Design a protein with these regions (language model features):
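Beta-hairpin "wing" of winged helix-turn-helix
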Residues: 49-66, 71
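N-terminal helix-turn-helix DNA-binding core of bacterial DNA-binding proteins
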Residues: 1-40
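Amphipathic alpha-helical dimerization/coiled-coil segments
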Residues: 75-103
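Conserved G/P- and acidic residue-centered "switch" motifs that form tight phosphate/ATP-binding loops
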Residues: 41, 73
C-alpha cells in the first residue's frame, strides 16, 4: 500500500517532488492516517525507482544538502492503474465481508 500511495502522489503531481514534500502531501491527503516516518519512504522510493516505476534527479538546494526529486515514469503510470484496480476490487470485497453482506 505504501508503494501505491507513493505512485499516486507522484502521479497526481505536475512537478517532481522530493521526499519531504511527498511525506507532507501524504499527511495532508491522508488526514494523518498515512503519516509516518519520512525515513521509511526512502527505501520504497528506491525500490520503485529500481523497478523503473520512478526516476529521480539530484538537484542543489539553497537551504541545505542536495535534494533527490522523484517523478513517475510511463511504466509507473501503467502500474498505478493496475494497482488501483486491484486495490478497489480488494477493498470492495473486504467491505462486503465487514458489512455482513456475505450470505
Amino acid at each position: 500500500t505504501v508503494s501505491l500511495v507513493l505512485l499516486a502522489v507522484l502521479g497526481q503531481s505536475r512537478q517532481p517532488m522530493y521526499g519531504y514534500q511527498i511525506a507532507k502531501r501524504l499527511e495532508e491527503v491522508g488526514e494523518g492516517v498515512l503519516a509516518g516516518k519520512q525515513s521509511a519512504l526512502y527505501p520504497v522510493l528506491r525500490n520503485l525507482e529500481a523497478y523503473g516505476l520512478l526516476e529521480s534527479e539530484v538537484e542543489p538546494s539553497v537551504s541545505g544538502p542536495p535534494r533527490r526529486y522523484y517523478r513517475i515514469t510511463k511504466l509507473g503510470r501503467e502500474a498505478l492503474r493496475e494497482w488501483v484496480a486491484a486495490w478497489s476490487a480488494t477493498r470492495d470485497s473486504v467491505d462486503t465481508v465487514l458489512q455482513g453482506g456475505v450470505t
